[in-house]
């Protein structure tokens, strides 16, 4: 494994809690006056010299498999007997053959051997097994000296970018704390909403709510009622309650438009670098659908100005989701 110790970004956590500003670039900026014959890497993080935006150039991933609608289990690399699952399993992880970052930083998490399952259809027991694996892999990757932050995530649906339809998620291990994650998990960062109009479901230890100012028309956050930093810090009851909430919320989302809704899901956890003692674990789920099979595209004014226009009122979404429970 590569040691990126000297290549880590130094991050300054401002006292005002605004977040993290990148002080040192890990990679050279694009050299517009350089030798045109210089080899251009297929996988390289770059930083916009004006906006400070980090963009990972991942040309090598253009060749990855694209089988979003495959129905034959014999063709699926994630089904038992397939390329990535030669033996029977309940849950399974492996290093991604088509990584977005070098150094064994990208892993795939298989939720179930059932090709036609969804995350929600696994039930509480099945989702709990996935959470256990998420926690295990988060801590294993975070123990590496070249890892500062671990992001667990899932893309569901071909329209979101999933290239294989078998139920699975992924994990990325960063050698720095991305700016958004630093803001959420840092001082004066994210905490659960106190607005009862936005909370729509809960159990003994977890609560689900619609964010106050969501970018996407469908957006939900699930979090512990008491502050916990990472998945591994949840006790057995907490993990069970999180599994219950995930299965519940994902089922409601599919009922929202009477269809399997495409979504993006990710887990915000405390980074492994210092300065994040106040981090509050949460799971975000968003979908671009503003109606059945009708996505809301983030358009020119939003991309250009960096301000967004959401046609769905958060309080109304929360009320609808509340009505869709069992």
Label for each model-derived stretch:
Residues 1-11, 35:
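Intrinsically disordered, low-complexity segments enriched in glycine and mixed charged residues
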Residues 2, 12, 19-23, 28:
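N-terminal non-cleavable signal-anchor helices
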Residues 24-27, 31-166, 172-231, 237, ...:
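Active-site microenvironments that recognize anionic phosphate/pyrophosphate groups
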Residues 239-245:
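Gly/Ser/Thr-rich active-site loops/lids in small-molecule metabolic enzymes
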């Amino acid at each position: 494994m590569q040691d990126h110790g000297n290549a880590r970004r130094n991050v300054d956590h401002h006292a005002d809690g605004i977040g993290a500003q990148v002080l040192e670039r890990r990679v050279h900026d694009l050299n517009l006056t350089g030798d045109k014959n210089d080899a251009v890497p297929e996988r390289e993080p770059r930083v916009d010299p004006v906006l400070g935006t980090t963009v990972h150039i991942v040309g090598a991933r253009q060749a990855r498999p694209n089988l979003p609608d495959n129905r034959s289990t014999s063709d699926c690399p994630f089904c038992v007997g397939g390329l990535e699952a030669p033996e029977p399993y309940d849950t399974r992880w492996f290093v991604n053959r088509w990584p977005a970052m070098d150094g064994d930083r990208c892993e795939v998490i298989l939720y179930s051997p059932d090709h036609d399952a969804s995350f929600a259809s696994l039930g509480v027991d099945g989702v709990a097994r996935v959470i256990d694996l998420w926690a295990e892999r988060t801590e294993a990757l975070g123990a590496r000296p070249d890892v500062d932050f671990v992001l667990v995530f899932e893309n569901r649906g071909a329209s979101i970018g999933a290239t294989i339809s078998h139920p699975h998620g992924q994990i990325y291990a960063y050698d720095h704390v991305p700016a958004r994650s630093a803001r959420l998990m840092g001082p004066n960062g994210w905490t659960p909403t106190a607005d009862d109009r936005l909370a729509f479901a809960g159990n003994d230890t977890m609560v689900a709510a619609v964010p106050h100012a969501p970018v996407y028309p469908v957006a939900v956050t699930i979090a512990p009622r008491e502050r916990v930093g990472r998945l591994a810090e949840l006790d057995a009851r907490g993990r069970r309650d999180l599994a219950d909430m995930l299965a519940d919320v994902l089922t409601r989302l599919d009922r929202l438009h009477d269809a399997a809704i495409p979504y993006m899901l990710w887990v915000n956890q405390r980074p492994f670098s210092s300065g994040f003692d106040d981090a509050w674990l949460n799971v975000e789920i968003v979908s671009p659908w503003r109606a059945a099979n009708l996505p809301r595209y983030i358009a020119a004014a939003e991309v250009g100005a960096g301000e967004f226009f959401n046609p769905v009122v958060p309080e109304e979404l929360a009320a609808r989701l509340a009505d869709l429970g069992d």
